[in-house]
Each structure stands twice: as C-alpha cells, then as structure tokens.
C-alpha cells in the first residue's frame, strides 16, 4: 500500500465563523496584469501606495543593515519606538508596533473581544475590522455611512453594555471623507468608559492641518472616559508598504494588554531600520505631501472636464462617479494597462477609486479613462 493516497480528501471540522469568512481581496499586482493581458509598462493606481517610491534614507539604511539578517530583531524595537514617541509627543510606554497597523487591529480584537462581545464598525470601511472580529467569534454591528460620512449618532445609539471596540477610519477608506474635530470631540465625550474607540488614521498625513484632530494629545492627557487608540502606518506617505510596519498610540494600560497577545519579533529588523530612517527623512515626506496635493488638484479639474464627478478627499485617493457600471470600466482600464479599484463590492456600483500617481501616471490614467468612458458610452 502506498504511503500517500492522493485521492483521500481531508475531512476538516471547520468552525462556522471561519467557514463563512471571505479572504481579503488585495489590489491586482502589476506583474499579474501583464501576464494575463500580455502587456507591458502598466501602472497601478489601486492600492493607495506612494507613487514616488520609498524614502531614499530608508533605502540606504536598509542596504547598510543587510549583513545583520542572521540575528533576530530587537523585540522591543527600542530605537524606532523612541523616535515615534518623540515624533508623536507621547511616552514610549504608550506605543505598540505591528507588522502593519492591521496587526495592531488584530491585537485589539484578540485582547478585548470574546464570544458575546460586540464591535461597531462602519460600512464601507477597512474590511479587516469585521474579519478579525468574525475570527474571534464576536458580533459585528455595522453602521452604514450617511452621505459618505461616519454616522456618529447612530453609532452612539448602537453602543450597549456588550460593546468593546468602535473602529472609525478617519479619513475614511474608500470615500476619503473626514470627521470635523469638534464632532469627534463631542463623540469621544459621549462614549462610556468600558468602550475603546479605535481611530484608524492611516491617511492622516495627507489631511489639511485645520481638519486634523490632535489625537496623540488626547491620549497623553487621557481625554474622555473611554479608551482612545490612534493607528498609524508607514505604508502611505512614507512609502514603506512592502516592509509592513505600523504602530498604535494608546494608554499604557492598553499597550500592556496588547503585548500579551503579540508575537515575539513581530516587526522585522529591516522594517525597524527603514521606518526609523523614513521618520527622519522630512524632505521626502514633505515632497510626497506636496506632490500629492498638486496631483489631486490637477486630476479633480481634468476629470470634471470629462463629465464625471470626483469626490473631495483628504487622502491620497478619491472616488469618481463614472455614471455607469464600475466593474465594466475597471475591466476596460485593465486592457489599457491601468489598474484602479471598482467600488461595486463596497456598495457603490457607479464609483471607482483612484490613487493619485506621478505626473506621468496621472496623465496616462486620464487618457485611458477618457477613452473608456467614450467606448462604454458613459458620458
């Protein structure tokens, strides 16, 4: 009898909450598009990455650290944590690092959600909030956006004694909308003490300063009765998506709890070195923000000229009402070597989401969009 019998199927007892989860749909990679469609020189404006690359200082620092890869990383990420504390104006004990800020989301759910716990999220927003809760066996309470903004009053009305976490991405992904600081302060002051409010600020770097709430100072001064968490990432403005490094700012008591569910060495050595260097590369950071603002302004004007309506955004991406089937437009754009995001899966069947690119990418996108709109008779 052969040692292995290929035709015997595994009989797995998969928990229902796991069986019902749909894997996260990442943006289509460039090499996959070029393999499937037989094209070259394609561009990707779908995943809100930094089109100007990574910080040169980060690249240099990583190159100089390649000889130390046989060593485990510093499990405390001391120097990166120290730099973040100085940057954010909080104590080192009020910071936790993650393999991307999404890992900090996972820490929070692992630490505070049980079978009967409830977590409030908005729809649409980052899909992983709900997935982590579902894996843990908690209950998702999903509140639809109101006029493409978080519906704070309905969220408040949904809070009960079982509510443990509230996730609010500010600015919101995929709409790019934000919450006025005064509204957010009132919301925080209305929350009970048993709730932790998680403000996902992945795109906060791109916001106008007068529209930004200084969440780190709220955390430092223990404002409100509820726990407050700010999630940040090096994936967007700092251009380090491939390194997977983010962090959370929160009260020391919450950090202590999250360390209990954190894997050792969760942020690798190169990510620590690269993020530390990127944090100090102010020139690259400021140039990224400037170029993003310039590109956003140009695209908004040109897209309106095509007869479409772009949606105002405080991020590095924006929505466009294409006045037709977004999935069809997405497919047609692929044939022209341009990857964008259809928003039909988010409940917006006539919208696409586009990342601001370089000047060359923006012009190529606009030409492809113009051609596709005409070919599909959308305008």
Swiss-Prot record:
Keyword check for Aminoacyl-tRNA synthetase: no
EC nos: 2.6.1.9
Record-linked CDD domains: AAT_like
Cofactor requirement: pyridoxal 5'-phosphate
TM helices/strands, residue ranges: none
Reactions it catalyzes: L-histidinol phosphate + 2-oxoglutarate = 3-(imidazol-4-yl)-2-oxopropyl phosphate + L-glutamate
InterPro entries reported in the protein's UniProt record: Aminotrans_II_pyridoxalP_BS, Aminotransferase_I/II_large, HisP_aminotrans, HistidinolP_aminotransfase, PyrdxlP-dep_Trfase, PyrdxlP-dep_Trfase_major, PyrdxlP-dep_Trfase_small
Annotated GO biological process: L-histidine biosynthetic process
N6-(pyridoxal phosphate)lysine modifications at: 236
Pathway this chain belongs to: Amino-acid biosynthesis; L-histidine biosynthesis; L-histidine from 5-phospho-alpha-D-ribose 1-diphosphate: step 7/9
NCBIfam families: hisC
Subunit description: Homodimer.
Protein name: Histidinol-phosphate aminotransferase
Organism in which the protein naturally occurs: Desulfotalea psychrophila (strain LSv54 / DSM 12343)
Gene designation per UniProt: hisC
